């Protein structure tokens, strides 16, 4: 079923109104916390919590949040399709990486020592 153009404009305007109310609610909760410090702490926190819950409940019906939930579900389905390596394969791969790292570091250390001694020899012969 295709949505007609006036319905699309109406839906777009409704989204804008929802986001305006969400923003207004969060700004109101900020002002309540900062400017009504004479009110008791528990009362202030209760009001702010109710406002935040109300803003979140409005946000759950916006198109962007619905798209986020669709993306999360698609990600979960993709995670199920992945073939994860077994513990033994992971352990062997880790040992190979550690061994190659140690081997390369020893080769570089040896090459550095040879170059250092060669340069020291050249400098000592020259002077």
Swiss-Prot record:
Keywords: Cell inner membrane, Cell membrane, Membrane, Protein transport, Translocation, Transmembrane, Transmembrane helix, Transport. InterPro entries: SecE_bac (IPR005807), SecE_sf (IPR038379), Translocase_SecE/Sec61-g (IPR001901). It is a multi-pass membrane protein. GO terms for molecular function: protein transmembrane transporter activity. PROSITE patterns: SECE_SEC61G. One of its GO terms (cellular component) is plasma membrane. It is found in: Cell inner membrane. One of its GO terms (biological process) is protein targeting. It comes from the Bacteria. The chain crosses the membrane at residues 17-37, 39-59, 95-115. Component of the Sec protein translocase complex. Heterotrimer consisting of SecY, SecE and SecG subunits. The heterotrimers can form oligomers, although 1 heterotrimer is thought to be able to translocate proteins. Interacts with the ribosome. Interacts with SecDF, and other proteins may be involved. Interacts with SecA. Belongs to the SecE/SEC61-gamma family. Essential subunit of the Sec protein translocation channel SecYEG. Clamps together the 2 halves of SecY. May contact the channel plug during translocation. This is Protein translocase subunit SecE. The lineage of its organism: Bacteria, Pseudomonadati, Pseudomonadota, Gammaproteobacteria, Enterobacterales. The gene is secE.
